[in-house]
Design a protein with these regions (language model features):
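A detector of single, family-specific signature residues
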Residues: 1-413
Length: 413
């Protein structure tokens, strides 16, 4: 095969060490380095001294990140999905893996993964940390529900939000050792304070010392997690408003012009795909494919097989589906009309994924063109496809047993 990169390097990365294979001028040199920063600097110097410009690294857990951070300023680093560079059956060693990566890179057979610039990666670190805090917070709240249910406290049957202000006051009293249901019911605020009888019955349980201890610890944990979320939100706001990168704030504002899309969705979108989209995604279709939100394309022998969506960026895919759910339940909008139109023939789940795909396309063009969302209206399909709507309604009437004859109304002068 034709050589594309005459001097290149393949690196097999592990937690404690890496093996680098340098190919060039008909020579093959393999060296081993530790993953300490001082050794990674030596690796960079070795590569640059030998005229290497292109490096391929397998995306192994988080171990590739320190190597990438050290090399990216001076070299063109290509992060490779291990599935795309898998060796044939046979011997497998770290040295052979690095040689295989270098050989595949030299002939241009490796496709690099999308790696955003450093300021986007810093924002991504914050949004993903927030997502982990939210998951942990949800788990703690669910655990609180289980603890009080196991003690026969039926607060959830009376209060719509157990973790609201009134609910927390009563839960704190339970954890503190209060046993009188009437006194705890007096802690209710708002509309809930008018349900004293129901609250007293719901709070009449059997908490033992273990229940109280666990409940108190969980309430403390929830408060800590909420405080941590406030801190990370402040950091995200500062990153979005960074004066050195004003395009972030502009994109953040433009994305929120889509109905049902809020500031959290906009923050995650920017953190996952950045704002210079055409550098990595030539078209909106490329972005949808990368996110795993479009149908698979499996054909063989003239037949099409499963159209199941492919694997993609789970953070971006998740936030797209969540945003699509909110957008499709807005009133008198294009997205809600599209969802209702699709759900009739493909069901709720597939229609939601289709709406998420449409949302990804919208986001791409909004960021790329730096223009706000243009609402097409809930009657868009009626206006643009009147014949199709006519055939649909005729077919429905015929299915109900009616004989349909269409006659155009006479227009009055």
């Amino acid at each position: 095969m034709e050589i594309v990169y005459h001097i290149c390097c393949g690196i097999d990365v592990h937690a404690r060490f890496l093996v680098a294979c340098l190919l060039g001028d008909g020579k093959q040199v393999t060296r081993r380095f530790s993953t300490m920063t001082c050794d990674l600097v030596k690796l960079r110097e070795w590569l640059t001294d030998n005229g290497c410009e292109y490096v391929a690294i397998e995306s192994t857990g988080v171990y590739w990140k320190p190597v990438f951070n050290i090399l990216e300023g001076d070299l063109k680093v290509i992060l490779v999905n291990p599935e795309h560079a898998r060796a044939l059956r046979g011997r497998k060693t770290d040295r052979l893996d690095s040689i295989r990566l270098a050989e595949l890179l030299s002939v241009g057979l490796l496709e690099g993964s999308f790696i955003p610039p450093p300021h986007i990666r810093r924002l991504r670190e914050l949004t993903r940390y927030r997502e982990s805090l939210v998951r942990t917070h949800t788990a703690a709240v669910n655990r609180i529900q289980k603890v009080i249910e196991s003690a026969n406290i039926k607060l959830a049957q009376v209060a719509s939000d157990v973790m609201g202000i009134s609910g927390r006051r009563m839960l704190s009293a339970l954890a503190a050792g209060v046993t009188d249901p009437a006194s705890m019911a007096q802690l209710a605020l708002g509309k809930l304070k008018h349900k004293q009888a129901e609250l007293q019955q719901a709070l009449d349980g059997a908490l033992d010392t273990s229940h109280r201890f666990v409940l108190g610890e969980l309430l403390r944990r929830v408060r800590e997690l909420e405080a941590a979320q406030e801190k990370v939100n402040a950091q995200i706001n500062r990153a979005i408003s960074d004066p050195d990168h004003p395009q972030l704030l502009k994109a953040w504002e433009l994305i929120q012009t889509i109905p049902g899309v809020g500031h959290i969705v906009a923050e995650v979108v920017i953190a996952e795909i950045g704002v210079n989209l055409r550098e990595s995604f030539p078209t909106a279709g490329h972005l949808a494919s990368w996110s795993g939100i479009c149908p698979g394309n499996k054909r063989s022998g003239g037949k099409r097989f499963s159209g199941k969506t492919r694997r993609g960026n789970r953070y971006f895919r998740t936030i797209l589906v969540q945003a699509a759910w909110a957008a499709t339940h807005t009133k008198q909008t294009y997205l809600s009309a599209m969802y209702r139109r699709l759900v009739r023939r493909m069901g709720k789940k597939k229609a939601l994924v289709a709406a998420a795909h449409t949302l990804a396309v919208m986001i791409y063009h909004i960021i790329d063109r730096s223009k706000p969302y243009l609402e097409l209206g809930a009657d868009y399909f009626d206006r643009t496809q009147p014949e199709k709507q006519l055939r649909y309604h005729v077919k429905r009437l015929q299915a109900m047993g009616f004989k349909v004859t269409l006659e155009k109304a006479i227009e009055m002068a």
